[in-house]
Amino acid sequence: MNKLHLVLLVLLVIAATVCTPLVFAEGEIPADVSLETLDYIVDHSAQYEKLRQAKIDSCKALIASSDDISKSGLYNQLFGFYYGFQSDSAITCARKGLEYARKCNNKTDEISSIIHLATLYQVTGCYFDSKRLLDNLDHSQMNSSQLYDIYSCYANIYDALEQIACDSILAEEYTANYNSYRDSLLTIDPENVFFRTGILVDKGRLVEALQTMKPYCDSLDVNDPIMGAAAYVVSGIYREMNKTSLEKEYLIKSCHSDLMHANREYISLTRLAEILYEEGDIVRAYNYLNRSIEDASYCKALQRMDMAAPMLSIVNTSYKRMNSRWLKFLSGISLSLIHI
């Protein structure tokens, strides 16, 4: 074997050792939850997005063959498929649903479409536009499901405003409003495990919060779309407890679920990348943060982009330094072998 072949062989062995990926069949959804399977899902997101797109295409075909009376409800259904996936398209669906609801004098669907618009405005950072739409609605005309949605939207608006408030008095006001709407949600759905857990966390009763949420999360199938949110809440409790390894375990579960269901409006992957960076796993942290930014940008989830962007700058610098050292290392090996 000549020197050049020996150099190439050594470099290939090193590359294979560092970069060997998991391989799954086309369309297969890996059931085990680990960083390795998460790597696969991140790298092969297109196949999971195809599954969601198929539902969208099916609903579009149904709308095309339906009468005007049915279209407002079908557009609201299509909104659900686009929500968390493509915000621009979701807004279009909400507007089309509103148009047909008003055309057919369907008050229930009209209210649902307005709430959908307000929800999208909140996700994309238009908090006061969202609130303006909600403030103009007559709550007496709403069913319990619509009240639940409107209170959820109000709560999310005030939660987001509290996080960006530059005035402590304003922040306290936003927090009080958030708590008020969360309490209203509990009157509608007193058994809601998410809200009950949130109240326990706010009171510092972390063990009780964990005992409330963790069994529920662990009972979910790994393919259940609720897993993303449930696992993230559990990870947050472990974070408050300073139990990073357990926080990381549930963040991986949350990311697995969100990405597998092509949900682009998430936060778990950003937090997981932060932990991986602190552990020295620079390559994964870099890849995960880039994916977070891309998804948030595509979905126009402004708050998610704001959360991920500062961390990306730090990780990006470390990634470039690591690559520079890696190239120097490979060059050193090459030169050593050439002189054998």
PLM feature spans:
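A "functional boundary" signal
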Residues: C19-R321
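Short, intrinsically disordered, charge-balanced linker/junction segments flanking boundaries
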Residues: S184, G332-S336
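Bacterial N-terminal signal peptides
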Residues: L8-V18
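Membrane-interface helix-start motif
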Residues: N316-I333
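Bacterial N-terminal signal peptides that target proteins for export
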Residues: M1-L8
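Conserved small/polar residues in nucleotide/adenosyl-binding loops
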Residues: I338-I340
